[in-house]
């Protein structure tokens, strides 16, 4: 049985409003899942070629749906810092630009240029993809099936653990360098040593 929990029984009005608009998500505690069900997916890379999550077999990785014209776009800088902080330990990340919320540029060339010029991004980034609904990329469909989570807005974060299962998800309001996100990554990295 899947269980959705809140870390605090009392939530502020701001938190409840953010939750209602999909900016904040609750923790998802998935049931045991065979690792192959979520573990390996490929994404078309915005730089050419593909990003294969198999390269992080036995290591945690974070998938974040992004947008270049969103109030949360400044999180790109923190995402790059997060990637830089843990990549030598084997941590992986995929930024997935999406126009599902009508806040992305019309072309991948514009997205790539914007991210490189404004945020000096070198983390793995896919081409613009759908992250929810019928047209969602297979990774997001698998996450929805296994954990019930689908992005409710831009900059939602999905941590895949060393065993290939969804460890946790976070909404837009969770900063990439937040204590809860970095602790979850560190916990998973300690399992992969």
Q: Residue ranges of each PLM-predicted region?
A:
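Bacterial N-terminal signal peptides
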Residues: 16-27
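Bacterial N-terminal signal peptides that target proteins for export
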Residues: 4-18
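Structural microenvironment flanking redox-active thiols in thiol-disulfide oxidoreductases
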Residues: 72-136
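Short pre-active-site segment immediately N-terminal to redox-active cysteine/selenocysteine motifs
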Residues: 59, 66-69, 97-100
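A short beta-strand-turn-helix
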Residues: 41-60, 83-86
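Thiol-/selenol-based redox modules, centered on thioredoxin-like
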Residues: 141, 146-193
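Bacterial Sec-dependent signal peptides at the C-terminal "C-region" and cleavage site
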Residues: 25-37
């Amino acid at each position: 049985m899947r269980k959705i929990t809140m870390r605090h029984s009392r939530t502020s009005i701001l938190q409840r409003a953010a939750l209602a608009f999909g900016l904040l998500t609750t923790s998802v505690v998935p049931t045991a899942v065979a690792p192959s069900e979520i573990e390996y997916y490929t994404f078309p890379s915005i730089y050419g070629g593909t990003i294969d999550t198999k390269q992080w077999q036995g290591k945690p990785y974070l998938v974040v749906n992004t947008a270049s014209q969103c109030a949360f776009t400044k999180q790109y800088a923190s995402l790059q810092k997060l990637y830089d902080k843990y990549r030598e330990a084997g941590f992986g990340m995929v930024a997935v630009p999406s126009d599902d919320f009508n806040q992305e540029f019309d072309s991948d060339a514009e997205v790539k240029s914007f991210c490189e010029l404004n945020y000096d991004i070198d983390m793995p980034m896919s081409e613009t993809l759908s992250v929810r609904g019928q047209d969602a990329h297979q990774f997001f469909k698998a996450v929805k099936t296994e954990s019930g989570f689908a992005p409710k807005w831009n900059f939602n974060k999905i941590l895949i653990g060393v065993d290939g299962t969804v460890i946790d998800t976070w909404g837009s309001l969770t900063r990439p360098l937040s204590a809860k996100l970095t602790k979850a990554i560190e916990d998973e990295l300690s399992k992969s040593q």
